[in-house]
Amino acid sequence: MSKETRDAAAEGRPSYKDTLNLLQTGFGMRANAVKREPELQAFWSDNGIDGQLGLQNDGPTFTLHDGPPYANGALHMGHALNKVLKDVINKYQVLKGRRVRYVPGWDCHGLPIELKVLQSMDQEQRKALTPIKLRKKAAAYARKQVDGQMKGFQRWGIWADWEQPYLTLQKEYEAAQIKVFGEMVLKGHIYRGLKPVHWSPSSRTALAEAELEYPDGHTSPSVYVAFPAMEVPTPLRDALKAEGLELPTETDALRQALQVAIWTTTPWTLPANLAVSVNERLDYALVDDGSGRMLVVAADLIESLSTTLERPLKHRATVKGALLAGLIYRHPLLDRTSPVVIGGEYITTESGTGLVHTAPGHGVDDFHTGQKHGLPVLCPVDEAGTLTAEAGPFAGLNVLKDANPGIIEALEQAGALLKQEAYSHRYPYDWRTKKPTIFRATEQWFASVEGFRQDALDAIDQVQWTPASGRNRIEAMVKERGDWCISRQRTWGVPIPVFYHHSNGEVLLNADTLSHIETLIASHGADVWWEKDETDLLPPAYANQADQWRKGTDTMDVWFDSGSSWAAVSSQRESLSYPADLYLEGSDQHRGWFQSSLLTSVAVNGHAPYKRVLTHGFALDEKGRKMSKSLGNVVDPMVIIEGGKNQKQEPPYGADVLRLWVSSVDYSADVPIGAGILRQLADVYRKVRNTSRYLLGNLHDFNPASDAIAVADLPLLDRWMLQRTAEVMHEITEAFESYEFFRFFQLLQNFCVTDLSNFYLDIAKDRLYVSAPTDQRRRSCQTVMALIIERLAGFIAPVLCHMAEDIWQNLPYPVQETSVFQRGWPTIPSDWRNDTLSAPVQQLRDLRAAVNKVLEDCRGRQELGASLEAAVRIDARSPELQAALSWLNDNGDPDVDGLRDWLLVSQLQLGGEPWAEVLSNHEDELALIEVSRARGTKCERCWHYEGDVGQHPDHAHICGRCVGVLERRTHQLV
């Protein structure tokens, strides 16, 4: 028994609760998502909705090609942002009738997995580990990680071809990758060379740009060093003589009198110094440092160097950099002389001395300058970062540990150290081991970007980039990038299928060998490279030469793996397209997957592998900080869904709230997430759910087939609601088409809360609850509610997929489609659109808001409770409001469109004399509003205050309108 019924019984009054049309629905007020969402996912699976629906559509193919996450570690908020964005887009395209097959992928090779395998073994097991055993264990580990991540993605409501994902360790994938490599070889884009590359001593392998990170706070020991001159070219002597400066001719005197000053942040590279480079266009000065010697420095840096070196520098002469070329200096630590040479535009006066220490084996600019001047590529550092015998007395020192202090001490003892100071700057670290990297010249395999750089830039122009800044970013990277080092000195990867001649190191890599290896890998997988010897790996034409060749041991950069996915997946699998319609990943992939995919596709086929690229930012905490265990600010997506250990502090919100978060953020920038944000999102989710529940609950006795009212016969309020729904649907469609999902979020929230709950449904309560069941005023509202709930379910389906399906399964009348996704994207009938309704209704909504403000003022003073306790007088001031009131009076349905009903007050007076007794009033440009207490008695059924309550003997406590309803109700329910 309800409180109202108990109170009525206690006072001897009849209860009319059972005569009202109350909510009836199985759609719960609470989502109970932990239980209900998996049930809905099982429903999709059992009915082939998630797997087959997209393939049954007959519209154009839509391919969102999945960038493969790494098969290692737990899922995090970055995964959630990425995968949910993709799923929202795919579900929208399915609803739009496009043919959609989403193939999820995983990146399965590489060092992290190899290290995980090694870390799980003791020393003895590692000693017994062969390459093929390591590969088998790595593959098993990767597959286990894939299984775990896949379950997580599925729990988020992600639809994909989970039965046939692509893994970069699959033999068909590896074969396609070999084919891409082979075609690049045959087109002349692949070569082997000795060049400085990013080298990780901690991983003992070369790294690509995309495998580097630049943490804050790195400090290097920088040194200013003087190299004594041994020989001065005649043109330089003559120029200095013309300025009144004559240099000694005797060598010992010259080396004391003239020295070239350099600056470096890598003292450990000084044993590899083979030149000092200058910019031929810069002015260089000879300055006296007060110790009986002259230093050569950039003229523009004299003042700053004087401060840095803490000594006055007296200017003696100035010459152009071009004249310094050919000066011979002596290495201050080794028995070696080297030249001053002309470098490039990388030599500036922004820092240092304007003269650059040049070690061709340890820097890209140094290497190119060395090549230009015929310098050897000296690299006295081994794979572990230890200086070799070529470093002379420094052999055995580690470049990242004791080499710098040892060399700095030697410089000081030699009198060559001008200054030492700590220098903070960006420095590359191995993204996996988090240890510093170095530049080290080694024999590596490269993809020569020069051969197709312009084609790649042209291809970038043909792609749509979202946001547009992405185009500038990748264009700058491709313009400036050097050749791509694609070889790695690791076991767990796809082999570079090359053979080397035993006697002379000649390389065997041609169409015949490539085709043979591709066929072997297609049949057996890349393990075949380690399982078989040269006799089987070489094609038949070379079988009798097998003893002359040895197979290579390098594997391919994992970015070449994932960068070949267009060849292994998009262009091979059924129901996919190449170029793909969309690539969608984090903004860091401009230098990663977007770029590696672009380069391989352009190199082989001359065009980009994608038509559009969309990038998102990173998930941060609510304070805008990166998530880290040390800060304790990591948000776990599975805790959002299932709840944490303390479910009061970390309640289970379900996957739809996680998905709603993704739709709420401007993903083009970094996006925050945390407990406070989740509470706000859960509140929005509840409002959408409660609005949906209210719509469903009022349709329990309604069947559109027999009970619907024609749109043309609907009251103004109902026709406006359809017009407003049409406007919102149009804007939501635009938001999905332009991938601006935050607009969808805002539109949905405003539609459910402002348009429906606070306005239309608030006004509709009287006719829904109080009317006789089949009264036209009720049926017209139910007609609108049915039309809206079906479309609401449809347009939230890409984001709130579980709620949308739950709504559909709780529709209380029969529909043709088993699932909301089978209905397709909601359509708007043309007769819903009536733009003439918008302006007058907006005026009336503004009036309603103004009246509510005055009523709230009365409530605040406890002079009124419910709005039905009020009587209101309105004197319209603005011409627009006056016109709207006339429009409503002339065109409105008296049973629905009375202004009194729209304002939810018991009495209303328009114009006339001011009231003598008012509780509150307000006047502005819109209207004068007066509020008084309603006259009459409260009807116990509809709660309106009416003058005829008590005039009906059989129903002494209700108004005449309700008496009439009860009579009709009795007749209708017979």
Curated annotation (Swiss-Prot):
Localization: Cytoplasm
UniProt short sequence motif 'KMSKS' region, positions renumbered to this chain: 626-630
SUPFAM superfamilies cross-referenced by the UniProt entry: Anticodon-binding domain of a subclass of class I aminoacyl-tRNA synthetases, Nucleotidylyl transferase, ValRS/IleRS/LeuRS editing domain
Residues annotated as binding L-isoleucyl-5'-AMP: E585
Sequence intervals crossing the membrane: none
Chemical reaction(s) catalysed: tRNA(Ile) + L-isoleucine + ATP = L-isoleucyl-tRNA(Ile) + AMP + diphosphate
Gene Ontology CC terms, in alphabetical order: cytoplasm
Record key words, sorted: Aminoacyl-tRNA synthetase, ATP-binding, Cytoplasm, Ligase, Metal-binding, Nucleotide-binding, Protein biosynthesis, Zinc
Motif 'HIGH' region, chain ranges: 69-79
Free-text comment on the cofactor: Binds 1 zinc ion per subunit.
GO biological process, one term: isoleucyl-tRNA aminoacylation
Cofactor(s), by name: Zn(2+)
Domain comment, as recorded: IleRS has two distinct active sites: one for aminoacylation and one for editing. The misactivated valine is translocated from the active site to the editing site, which sterically excludes the correctly activated isoleucine. The single editing site contains two valyl binding pockets, one specific for each substrate (Val-AMP or Val-tRNA(Ile)).
Protein name (database record): Isoleucine--tRNA ligase
Annotated organism of origin: Parasynechococcus marenigrum (strain WH8102)
